UniProtKB/Swiss-Prot annotation:
Main EC class the enzyme belongs to: ligase
Family designation: Belongs to the class-II aminoacyl-tRNA synthetase family. ProS type 1 subfamily.
Subunit text: Homodimer.
Species whose genome carries this gene: Bordetella parapertussis (strain 12822 / ATCC BAA-587 / NCTC 13253)
Job description of the protein: Catalyzes the attachment of proline to tRNA(Pro) in a two-step reaction: proline is first activated by ATP to form Pro-AMP and then transferred to the acceptor end of tRNA(Pro). As ProRS can inadvertently accommodate and process non-cognate amino acids such as alanine and cysteine, to avoid such errors it has two additional distinct editing activities against alanine. One activity is designated as 'pretransfer' editing and involves the tRNA(Pro)-independent hydrolysis of activated Ala-AMP.
Keyword S-adenosyl-L-methionine annotated: no
Catalytic activity: tRNA(Pro) + L-proline + ATP = L-prolyl-tRNA(Pro) + AMP + diphosphate
GO MF terms held by the record: aminoacyl-tRNA deacylase activity; ATP binding; proline-tRNA ligase activity
Enzyme Commission identifier(s): 6.1.1.15
Domain note: Consists of three domains: the N-terminal catalytic domain, the editing domain and the C-terminal anticodon-binding domain.
Name of this chain's protein: Proline--tRNA ligase
Length: 576
């Protein structure tokens, strides 16, 4: 491609709303243009990157035995009602009506549609296993779209769905797709981790996220540098304490703590470590009849509640945070001074493992501006009704596999694989005849990759102060040739054109910048766009018999003889 015949429109400044590097740089490089909140036009450079990602994904899906199809963006509500997700999915599911007032959705995912296809197309075990995939536009009505393509409302994903006759076969399909995902992200040249994850609204019994490592990631990844253990923060298990609880050494005392409504303030006021305090979190579970059931969850003052773990406890499915009215009714006190001792009304008490092991702790006294000091289980209050892992792990916690301490880093989720089992096939009655001629329910897996999110994630991991630094595999162009003096020197033009044609003939995706721009402007623009390798052809260099090769990741350019320019460019590309 020649720049004079292409659309390049870079910007000096990013829009004020662009908070992270990928959003800023994609906008400045002319890759995307905002149409509405969370909705973008992919400009030519941006679309080229997307198509290259899709190409790698498609190759690996095909190699793994998956078969491509294309399912519609608009889906009938009846399928979502049949699966039960019409009500479960929430406000992110964009619901629309046609002219006949029939309900439809703009698909955020395609489990219902693919299961409907399976129940109509698969009749016999002889047709199994099967794995279908598509690369399609999705829509999720995010409350607060932000970060450009990272959390948009309209985006592109690859979804694959496997169908097997039994659980063992479904596990094999899961493992095949897991391995395919490993290959995809390796080919994309991204630093990533596969981590055990919660199944969320998709459901199923097992899942892994593929997380691109980036400081701006919204997810926290927990891993053990000394082993293969890795999980996201939602699933990472905080270890049980092995040491016995210490015997009480203090008497229970109600102490004044005026204005100290947070554990940090209480600890500072009393001159105690934050880890000696207990925070009280009040949840409510609505009942079919009568008032909501109220629960008191207790965590150490320096720990944070893991809502996913809490929601999996018996009786806490579908919980919400209690209202102030419910809190006052059950504790006789407003939030800030709540505790498990002498509540106004009975509540269910769940203690985190660390809290259940504490002695002489500080907790709210259910009286404004007062806390108890020297509180002890069994003496001052009953043992907790339930002891469970309620908290997020922290850096340095012992690894659940017993092989060292945990580390935590941030990541961007770009892929997710799920072992669904029969969640959707049972709901939609997707069955087949087994080898005994009897009906059996299909075993399923589903596997997603965020194609457009990968674009942003790759930039977050590969950029500097000057712009994007694309991995070669997904760069919009692999090489840019920058002739200095294009309009003045026939030798420069002829040399640049000859190299351009030679690279094209060898299948290199190359751009020739024939716009006759000033060198500084031209170089800065291509550094912003992030092409991995720049070849500079100038009259001064040609007089010395050389051209310059400048890898985007490297500080220094290399001079190579003109007659070796093609070979050296190809050799340099192979190293990128």
């Amino acid at each position: 491609m020649r720049a004079s015949k292409y659309h390049l429109n870079t910007l000096k400044e990013a829009p004020a709303e662009a908070e992270i590097a990928s959003h800023q740089l994609m906008t400045r490089a002319g890759m995307i243009r905002k149409l509405a909140g969370g909705i973008y036009t992919y400009m030519p450079l941006g679309l080229k990157v997307i198509r290259k990602i899709e190409g790698i994904v498609r190759e690996e899906m095909n190699a793994a035995g998956a078969i491509e199809l294309l399912m519609p963006v608009v889906q009938p509500a009846e399928l979502w009602m049949e699966s039960g997700r019409w009500e479960q999915y929430g406000a992110e599911l964009l619901r629309i009506k046609d002219r006949h007032q029939r309900d439809f959705v703009l698909q955020p995912t395609s489990e219902e549609v693919i299961t409907d296809i399976a129940r109509n197309e698969i009749q016999s075990y002889r047709q199994l296993p099967l794995n279908f995939y598509h690369i399609q536009t999705k829509f999720r009505d995010e409350r607060r779209p932000r970060f450009g393509l990272m959390r948009g409302r309209e985006f592109t994903m690859k979804d694959a769905y496997s169908f097997d006759r039994d659980e063992a076969g479904a596990q094999r399909s899961y493992d095949i797709m897991y391995a395919a995902y490993q290959r995809i992200f390796q080919r994309l040249s991204l630093e990533f981790r596969a981590v055990a994850a919660d199944t969320g609204s998709i459901g199923g019994s097992r899942s892994h996220e593929f997380q691109v490592i980036a400081d701006t990631g919204e997810d926290l990844i927990v891993y053990n540098p000394e082993s293969d253990y890795a999980a996201n923060i939602e699933l990472a298990e905080a270890p049980a304490l092995l040491a016995a609880r210490a015997a009480p050494a203090q008497d229970l005392e109600a102490v004044p703590t005026p204005g100290a409504a947070k554990c940090e303030d209480v600890a500072k006021l009393l001159g105690l470590p934050l880890a000696r305090t207990i925070k009280s979190i009040v949840l409510a579970v609505d009942q079919p009849e009568g008032p909501a059931q109220v629960w008191l969850l207790l965590l150490r003052g320096d720990h944070e509640l893991n809502e996913i773990k809490a929601g999996k406890l018996p009786g806490l499915a579908g919980f919400r945070f209690a209202t102030e009215t419910e809190i006052v009714d059950h504790f006789g006190c407003k939030p800030g001074y709540l505790g498990p001792i002498k509540t106004a009304r009975p509540v269910h008490v769940v203690a985190d493992r660390t809290v259940a092991n504490m002695a002489d702790f500080v907790c709210g006294a259910n009286r404004e501006d007062y806390h108890y000091q020297g509180a002890n289980w069994g003496r001052d209050l009953p043992e907790p009704e339930l002891v469970a892992d309620l908290r997020n792990v922290v850096e340095g916690d012992p690894s659940p596999d017993g092989k060292g301490a945990l580390s935590i880093q941030r990541g961007i989720e770009v892929g997710h694989v799920f072992f669904l089992g029969t969640k959707y096939s049972e709901a939609l009655k997707a069955t087949f005849l087994d080898d005994n001629g009897k009906p059996a329910v299909l075993q399923m897996g589903c596997y997603g990759i965020g194609v457009t999110r990968i674009v942003g994630a790759a930039i977050e991991q590969n950029h500097d102060a000057r712009g994007i630094i694309w991995p070669r595999a997904i760069a919009p162009y692999e090489v840019v040739i920058c002739p200095v003096g294009w309009g003045k020197s026939e030798t420069v033009r002829d040399t640049a054109l000859a190299l351009y044609e030679a690279l094209r003939a060898r299948g290199v995706d190359v751009m020739l910048d024939d716009r006759d721009s000033r060198p500084g402007v031209m170089f800065a623009e291509w550094e912003l766009i992030g092409v991995p390798l720049r070849v500079t052809v100038g009259e001064r260099g040609l007089n010395e018999g050389v051209v310059e090769l400048q890898a985007r990741r490297e500080a220094e350019a290399a001079k190579v003889p003109v007659d070796q320019a093609l070979a050296q460019t190809l050799a340099k590309l192979d190293l990128l």
